[in-house]
Swiss-Prot record:
One of its GO terms (biological process) is translation. This is Large ribosomal subunit protein bL12. Forms part of the ribosomal stalk which helps the ribosome interact with GTP-bound translation factors. Is thus essential for accurate translation. The keyword Ribonucleoprotein applies. Homodimer. Part of the ribosomal stalk of the 50S ribosomal subunit. Forms a multimeric L10(L12)X complex, where L10 forms an elongated spine to which 2 to 4 L12 dimers bind in a sequential fashion. Binds GTP-bound translation factors. Keywords: Ribonucleoprotein, Ribosomal protein. Pfam families: Ribosomal_L12, Ribosomal_L12_N. HAMAP family: Ribosomal_bL12.
Length: 121
């Protein structure tokens, strides 16, 4: 069976909106499919990201300047030196949870400035 994609596209360009609507309905019935996007799945994921107001700052790697990263983590979290070192050594680990976007970006910038790898969740 010969399939001429360009001819089909040309025909679609010339068709009216109502003809295209009828075509979509016929294809849905013939192949038992739906042209509607999976709104419940895709909408939930996209809506969650757009409406997110609290973030978790995750240290993924301390990099080569581990001592500097420990000092920054200690200052940010208020942990003692031993606990801050354990947090950095245990990377990937959460540095701070449930923080606003601005604060999360500030923390990320401070950690990246001393060579750490950071992600926001």
């Amino acid at each position: 069976m010969a399939f001429d994609k360009d001819a089909i596209i040309a025909s679609l360009k010339e068709a009216s909106i109502s003809d295209l609507n009828d075509l979509v309905k016929a294809i849905e019935e013939e192949f038992d499919v739906s042209a509607a996007a999976p709104v419940a799945v895709a909408g939930a994921a996209g809506g969650e990201a757009a409406a997110k107001d609290s973030f978790t700052v995750e240290l993924t790697s301390a990099g080569s300047a581990k001592v500097k990263v420990i000092k920054v983590v200690k200052d940010i979290t208020g942990l003692g030196l031993k606990d801050a070192k354990a947090l950095v050594d245990g990377a990937p680990s959460n540095v701070k949870e449930d923080v606003k976007e601005d604060e999360a970006n500030d923390i990320k910038a401070k950690l990246e400035e001393v060579g750490a790898s950071v992600t926001l969740k």
